Amino acid sequence: MAYCIINCTTKNKEEAIYIAKSLVERKLIACCNIVPSITSVYEWDNELCCDEECLMVMKTKTELFNEVEIAIKELHTYDTPEIICIPINNGSREYLSWVNEQTK
């Protein structure tokens, strides 16, 4: 079984919690850590932006990535949310077993 971390940024903590709860309830992710304040610097519509955001760090099975991506896009307020999948090469056997049990 392959596992991954999915990162996603949101406009605030409330949106991150809303998305995380929905994904956990749907059994698409086992867990989401929410980092409440990060600073993102980027260009959007030819304008340099510097915004405070939240970072969601989600753990799941790699095979569920497409479903997670669809769900995030459905729930998210951004036009183009950051949705990045990072493979987990190694991890605690017990923890990854728990991730497996918590997801569909």
Walk through the language-model features, giving the residues of each.
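Positively charged, small/polar-rich N-terminal and surface patches that mediate targeting and assembly
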Residues: M1-K104
